[in-house]
């Protein structure tokens, strides 16, 4: 999950804007089921820094994952609810999520796990400057 405010087009990532749109439209931030599914995440500026480093230093054909941590979707929806001054986030079923977000978004993006480790990036000398998606939501989400 890449988060942060980008400067180019499109200026939004996928998951967090979908969660925010739904929360604003309904007045309730939501997660699917218990929200225990986890996603590795990284700030867009840290991704850009890794691209720059990889172009300069990585051998051709190098494959890298990039992450600065991971978070459960329940914690992300809680941070969104707090930022938007809503009540506590609420769970909804997969069927409700599919009706709102469509099957691919609900099942593969907001209802699944995506956990990686950025070992190759770290071995290259990359280190993230932003480490918390929930802190970014609390302080910078617009």
What are these regions (language model features)?
Residues 50-105:
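Mid/C-terminal beta-alpha module of Rossmann-like enzyme folds, strongest
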Residues 4-17, 53-64:
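Glycine/proline-rich active-site loop of Rossmann-fold NAD(P)-dependent oxidoreductases
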Residues 2-12, 33-44:
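Glycine-rich "substrate-gating" loop/helix at the edge of Rossmann-like oxidoreductase active sites
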Residues 38, 96, 136:
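Positions that flank functional sites
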Residues 131-142:
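Amphipathic terminal alpha-helices
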Residues 18-42, 50:
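A conserved pocket-lining segment of Rossmann-fold NAD(P)-dependent short-chain dehydrogenase/reductase
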Residues 44, 74, 99-127:
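Conserved C-terminal active-site "lid" loop/helix of NAD(P)H-dependent oxidoreductases
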